[in-house]
């Protein structure tokens, strides 16, 4: 069962992104009011604002948490053409009964983009402290902090150009087939071409290059999200566009050759409206999508390995509705598929059972 509990965010404008930290006990929100808020869960299911500050001089599109191994670090991107990295600093206790003061300090501002920075995301932990940004000029920039104790230095490691403006990106957390795999989407509506692009690190050229395009998705894309790898021999990518898509990526001839992909696209039209955000649970057994209708839909894979909508959570605190489960096999069908055994003889000199 799912409980819907509204949270009074107290933002003065549209909220563009809501992101939980690694443990799910902290939450970051960003808005067109140019502020970022950090929320902490009190252990009783209540969320309280512990920090709030003006982070940019324009609308803030996205916020991303770094892995806790690198400390309490978030990154933000904005319409003001910059991305910023923030670190939480804990001050001294005023008295023995008070908790230490907390504040977020801007460690660096990335100013390479000439247009709006539309998305920002930290790389998986095993790659180190990497940060990728996507911008409206169609460029993906990958930065690296060479010294995790000094977050003021973020040199550009890779710069990937694309013909279309970019609206979103996602790191693949799996090391299967390739160690660095990125997906990016474009919300450009004028050209009827593929709007999802795949990038990977090339050992030959020593840089990240575009390896493929998902040509089946030609509508503007607002979000992409790679599924966590749970022992699969292929990658799954969720795409939010005019409809919801799940893209399966497999190697064609050689499982280790990421440059040759078999791309299978599955389309879901149940939203009947544009889809804005997508995300997975930790085991990639559930996909969550939000649409222009103000509903959150939960998708599960059934026994036939087909994705079906399992529940719809409606806004304004109304209760969830559950989709009917697919029919289970009847007894006759199950019995007909059951193997029958016949006694053919006995074994001599059996060991007595004690």
Swiss-Prot record:
It holds the Pfam family WD40. GO terms for molecular function: structural molecule activity. It comes from the Eukaryota. GO terms for biological process: cell division; cellular response to amino acid starvation; germarium-derived egg chamber formation; meiotic cell cycle; negative regulation of autophagy; oogenesis; positive regulation of autophagy; positive regulation of cell size. Its main location: nucleus. Keywords: Cell cycle, Cell division, Differentiation, Lysosome, Meiosis, Mitosis, Nucleus, Oogenesis, Protein transport, Repeat, Transport, WD repeat. One of its GO terms (cellular component) is GATOR2 complex. Probable component of the nuclear pore complex (NPC). Involved in maintaining the localization of another nucleoporin Mgtor to the nuclear envelope of early meiotic female germline cells. It is not involved in recruiting the nucleoporins Mgtor, Nup107, Nup153 and FG-containing nucleoporins to the NPC. An essential component of the GATOR subcomplex GATOR2 which functions as an activator of the amino acid-sensing branch of the mTORC1 signaling pathway. The two GATOR subcomplexes, GATOR1 and GATOR2, regulate the mTORC1 pathway in order to mediate metabolic homeostasis, female gametogenesis and the response to amino acid limitation and complete starvation. GATOR2 activates the mTORC1 signaling pathway through the inhibition of the GATOR1 subcomplex, controlling the switch to cell proliferation growth under nutrient replete conditions and growth during female oocyte development. This is Nucleoporin seh1. It comes from Drosophila melanogaster (Fruit fly).
């Amino acid at each position: 069962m799912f409980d819907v509990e509204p949270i009074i965010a107290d933002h003065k404008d549209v909220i563009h992104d809501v992101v939980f930290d690694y443990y799910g006990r902290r939450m970051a929100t960003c808005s067109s009011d140019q502020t970022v808020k950090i929320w902490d869960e009190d252990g009783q299911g209540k969320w309280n604002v512990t920090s709030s500050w003006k982070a940019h001089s324009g609308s803030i599109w996205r916020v991303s948490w770094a892995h806790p191994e690198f400390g309490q670090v978030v990154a933000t991107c904005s319409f003001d053409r910059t991305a910023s990295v923030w670190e939480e600093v804990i001050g001294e206790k005023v008295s023995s009964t008070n908790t230490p003061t907390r504040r977020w300090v801007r460690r660096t501002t990335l100013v390479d983009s000439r247009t709006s920075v539309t998305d920002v995301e930290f790389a998986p932990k095993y790659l180190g402290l990497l940060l990728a940004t996507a911008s409206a000029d169609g460029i993906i920039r990958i930065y690296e902090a060479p010294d995790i104790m000094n977050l003021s230095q973020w040199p550009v490691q890779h710069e990937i150009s694309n013909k279309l403006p970019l609206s979103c990106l996602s790191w693949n957390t799996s090391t299967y087939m390739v160690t660095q795999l990125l997906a990016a989407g474009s919300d450009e509506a004028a050209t009827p071409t593929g709007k999802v692009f795949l990038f990977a690190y090339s050992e030959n050229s020593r840089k990240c290059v575009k390896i493929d395009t998902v040509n089946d998705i030609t509508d503007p894309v607002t979000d992409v999200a790679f599924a966590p790898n749970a022992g699969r021999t292929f990658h799954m990518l969720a795409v939010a566009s005019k409809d919801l898509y799940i893209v399966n990526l497999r190697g064609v001839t050689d499982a280790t050759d990421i440059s040759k992909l078999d791309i299978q696209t599955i389309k879901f039209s149940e939203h009947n409206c544009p889809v804005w955000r997508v995300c997975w649970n930790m085991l990639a057994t559930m996909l969550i999508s939000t649409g222009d209708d103000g509903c959150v839909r939960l998708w599960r894979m059934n026994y036939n390995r087909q994705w079906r909508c399992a529940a719809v959570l409606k806004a304004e605190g109304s209760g969830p509705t559950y989709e009917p489960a697919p029919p289970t096999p009847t007894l006759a069908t199950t019995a007909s598929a059951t193997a029958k055994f016949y006694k053919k003889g006995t074994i001599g000199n059996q060991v007595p059972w004690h």
